[in-house]
């Protein structure tokens, strides 16, 4: 499938990956209700009316990367699939 369809499915809560990715255990999914802990130990909820509280998370063997950005190759690829 193409990137446009992949984004639609991502918004529906599906996990997606590309056939062309080296690690077969790698995928992206939509992260919601994002919060973080600051240096004082306070949990900060990043809910903002202007920017929302969602981001694309890349999940791989090294852990989770919040705020994954698609490359041009990712956006133009037709090898996206649901996990």
How would you name each of these model-derived features?
Residues 53-83:
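Short, compact, well-ordered microdomains
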Residues 1-47, 58-64, 75:
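Catalytic phosphate/metal-binding cores of nucleic-acid and nucleotide-processing enzymes, i.e., regions
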